Swiss-Prot record:
Keywords: Cell inner membrane, Cell membrane, Cytoplasm, GTP-binding, Membrane, Nucleotide-binding, Ribosome biogenesis, RNA-binding, rRNA-binding. It is found in: Cytoplasm; Cell inner membrane. It comes from the Bacteria. Residues 65-69 are annotated as: G2. This is GTPase Era. Residues 148-151 are annotated as: G4. GO terms for biological process: ribosomal small subunit assembly. An essential GTPase that binds both GDP and GTP, with rapid nucleotide exchange. Plays a role in 16S rRNA processing and 30S ribosomal subunit biogenesis and possibly also in cell cycle regulation and energy metabolism. It comes from Nostoc sp. (strain PCC 7120 / SAG 25.82 / UTEX 2576). GO terms for cellular component: cytosol; plasma membrane. It is a peripheral membrane protein.
Length: 324
């Protein structure tokens, strides 16, 4: 089974939950558990998730708060099954959406077996890292400090390393350095995580790499292109609703609505003569075709919903709610 087909089979697994699901019995020494990936915005949590599972299931961009939903990535080896939970970056919220994202990230800390606290190894430990560290000391969940972006460290990185050594020593956390971008030292990270897991069952079929349905990932791939192609004022005000997915033997038809808060943002997304919307659609279509390993017809619409990020009702309609 190809990587693309592993993701494309998600809906089949989910739709069969009411019946029998093919989950084998784990051997006696098998380990399994849930690992929460926690950290400030833009420290590389989603890039790490994609590297660990071996394919793209989480979108990435230079824009803070790219991740909005708790996304699970599943890594299964002969010895263990690791379920990684990628969470929104923890920050001070400024609206209802921000509050939902941060609450979900905090809930993840209490609902996992191990916390992987990811920091940016290209810069010294800062106030945002210490804020998260203070949250973690109130949790009984074991914590591993993961220092990412070692490939981007300056030649003289001694002070950077010392700042994280002090943090790890203060809280008595084991530490591992790696690069999510290049994959360097990720086997060592995975080995350390397995050491902290208990013996347990398969939670998911061994060939599954995420528990999210295709429609969710399609929406995220569209949002990713908006983050990459539009100016700073638009990305945080965007939500995607997948209105239709219609499969035929030759092509999959996808209709999606892009929700924004202001008419000016709608104008930016459409662009002169529809040029921006065309660019977004073309780039998103390519990514969705990789996801499902087939041809896609993608049609995008833009709708203004004033202050949707500040309305609990609107947030719920668009799929954003505090997770249990």
């Amino acid at each position: 089974m190809t990587a693309e087909l592993k993701v494309a089979s998600i809906d089949n697994h989910i739709s069969s939950l009411s019946g029998e699901v093919s989950i084998p019995q784990a051997p006696p020494e098998f380990k399994s558990g849930f690992i929460g990936i926690i950290g400030r915005p833009n420290v590389g949590k989603s890039t790490l998730m994609n590297q660990l599972v071996g394919q793209k299931i989480a979108i990435t961009s230079p824009v803070a708060q790219t991740t909005r939903n708790r996304l699970r990535g599943i890594v299964t080896t002969p010895e263990a099954q690791l379920i990684f939970v990628d969470t929104p970056g923890i920050h001070k919220p400024h609206h209802q959406l921000g509050e939902v994202l941060v609450k979900n990230a905090k809930l993840a800390i209490e609902s996992v077996d191990v916390v992987l606290f990811v920091v940016d190894g290209a810069v010294a430990c800062g106030a945002g890292d210490r804020f998260i560290a203070d949250l973690l000391i109130h949790s009984k969940t074991p914590v591993i400090l993961g220092i990412n972006k070692v490939d981007q460290q300056p030649p003289d990185s001694q002070k950077i390393d010392e700042s994280y050594q002090q943090l790890a020593s203060a809280y008595q956390w084991p530490t591992v350095k790696f690069s999510a971008k290049t994959g360097a030292e990720l086997p060592q990270l995975q080995e350390l995580l397995v050491e902290h897991l208990e013996h347990g069952p398969y939670y998911y079929p061994p060939d599954l790499v995420t528990d999210q349905p295709e429609r969710f990932i399609m929406g995220e791939l569209i949002r990713e292109q908006i983050l990459l192609l539009t100016r700073e004022e638009v990305p945080h005000s965007v939500a995607i609703a997948i209105d239709l997915v219609e499969e035929t033997p030759t092509i999959t038809r996808v209709l999606a609505t892009i929700h924004v808060e202001r008419d000016s943002q709608k104008g930016i997304l459409i662009g002169k003569g529809g040029s921006m919307l065309k660019s977004i659609g073309s780039a998103a279509r390519e990514q969705i075709q990789k996801l499902i390993a087939g041809k896609v017809y993608l049609e995008l619409f833009v709708k203004v919903q004033p202050k949707w990020r500040h309305s609990r009702v609107r947030l719920a309609e668009l799929g954003y709610r505090v997770e249990e």
